[in-house]
């Protein structure tokens, strides 16, 4: 199994090194990661700038290719020819923070895995909930990733499917397992913060409190709150099928 690994937190993120380490136990791994943090960049692609890539090392000293593009650029560049062959799976993460529910619309982590689908390669996005004490421990995430990717290797995934995996901030001993769940809803409480530079010109920050989570049964948010890792199948088709027939009944003539 040949696995392409990337992230959106940048090549020096400890989550990326932890992901590469566990996947190296399962298959052959190639890392192509961005040279900086692209959190919340979504599926941004650099269409009007050249891309550059060079050899480097991750935070644990393991080898990687570093790219000055976005997470999606890293995947496209790798599949289009930076690697010597097409990967069997694209895995993005381990993101330093949740990608639950509505977060997927913003997530560079998820977008990188989705870029694999554009090229016919199934994807896995991996994120870990931010620990309250700020001390990152990826062992539980590695347990969940190992179990899931071994099942993927055994059973396979269709090329149009992305799996979104979130892991709570727990130890391997207290992780209750993996629960398959649908996307939940997070309500963002953003605020516009206005400040002024020394010349009196305004500049802006978009800030705010933590999102309000709707912890409905069967959602990824509920699974995390119960101590499970959440696993959600995601597809590229964003069509609202419920509204297709309704819109067709509108008066178009």
Curated annotation (Swiss-Prot):
Keywords: Cytoplasm, Hydrolase, Metal-binding, Nucleotide-binding
A molecular function GO annotation: metal ion binding
Record field: catalytic activity: a ribonucleoside 5'-phosphate + H2O = a ribonucleoside + phosphate
Lineage: superkingdom: Bacteria
Cofactor(s) this protein requires: a divalent metal cation
Keyword Cell cycle on entry: no
Localization annotation: Cytoplasm
Binding site for a divalent metal cation: 8-9, 39, 95
Pfam family, one: SurE
Cellular compartments per GO CC: cytoplasm
EC number: 3.1.3.5
Cofactor annotation comment: Binds 1 divalent metal cation per subunit.
Transmembrane intervals: none
HAMAP family in alphabetical order: SurE (MF_00060)
Family, per entry: Belongs to the SurE nucleotidase family.
Family matches, as NCBIfam families: PRK00346.1-4, surE
The protein's name in its UniProt record: 5'-nucleotidase SurE
Native organism taxonomy: Bacteria, Bacillati, Chloroflexota, Chloroflexia, Chloroflexales
Gene for this chain: surE
């Amino acid at each position: 199994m040949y696995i392409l690994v990337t992230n959106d937190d940048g090549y020096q993120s400890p989550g990326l090194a932890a992901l590469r380490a566990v996947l190296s136990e399962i298959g052959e791994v190639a890392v192509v990661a961005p040279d900086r943090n692209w959190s919340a960049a979504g599926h941004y692609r650099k269409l009007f700038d050249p891309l550059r890539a060079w050899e480097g090392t991750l935070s644990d000293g393991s080898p990687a290719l570093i790219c000055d593009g976005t997470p999606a650029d890293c995947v496209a560049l790798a599949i289009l020819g930076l690697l010597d062959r097409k990967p069997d799976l694209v895995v993005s993460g381990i993101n330093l923070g949740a990608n639950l529910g509505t977060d997927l619309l913003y997530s560079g982590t998820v977008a990188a895995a989705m870029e694999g689908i554009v090229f016919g390669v199934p994807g896995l996005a991996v994120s870990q909930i931010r620990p309250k004490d700020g001390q990152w421990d990826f062992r539980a995430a590695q347990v969940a990733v190992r179990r899931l990717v071994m099942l993927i290797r055994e059973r396979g995934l269709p090329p149009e499917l992305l799996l979104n995996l979130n892991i709570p901030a727990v130890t391997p001993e207290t992780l209750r397992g993996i629960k398959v769940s649908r996307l939940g809803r997070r309500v963002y409480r953003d605020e516009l913060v206005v400040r002024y530079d020394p010349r009196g010109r305004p500049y802006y920050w978009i800030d705010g409190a933590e999102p309000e989570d709707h912890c409905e049964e069967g959602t990824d948010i509920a699974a995390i709150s119960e101590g499970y890792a959440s696993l959600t199948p995601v597809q590229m088709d964003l069509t609202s099928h419920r509204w297709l027939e309704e819109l067709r009944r509108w008066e178009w003539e």
